[in-house]
Amino acid sequence: MDRASLSDDAAFTRRGEAWSEVTRLADGAFRVRLGGPFPAAWLSILSSHLAERNVSIDHTHARHTEEIWIAEFHLIALPSAPDLLSVDYIELAESGIAGSAGSFELDSYRLLESRDYGGTLMLTLEARDSLGLLSSLLSSLAELDLYPLELHIETRNGRAYDSLWLARAGGGPPSPRTIASTLDVLDGALTKPS
């Protein structure tokens, strides 16, 4: 059963097991909380749709547990963005359609094998923030069959400081070949010294 409620400063939607709650924090700034059994690529899909709508992701924490995702996004509506209280975040996350991986630039990164979640890659990175950075990164990783099981995204003073725990779709550690391909993609995204 679908349920929805909307006020001047908040909106709530429930669709099946998925739900979203949006709260206006300040002029143009919103907190979006989402939960549900979303597909592996949902973060890539949602971030792509948000970038297409001129919505900047300021910071995020998302985590997958027991087949359910829980996430909190702090979003900034840029000029020509829609009213973020009226966006159907569940529909966007479940749409199954994402833009293709665009180019992105990293200033630095570190990729480590981790035992977290039964075997993941932990990626930490720093980059100049830009609209679509997260979308491009996640889309590039999805092309390698890598998806985050947990991520922390933070933007400070125009800089992105991100940490992601990556696994294959359905969980499980990436293969040595996937790790090598991931290093190639990340090395190719490093900014070149002037």
Name each model feature, range by range.
Residues M1-S194:
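Regulatory modules associated with amino-acid/nitrogen control
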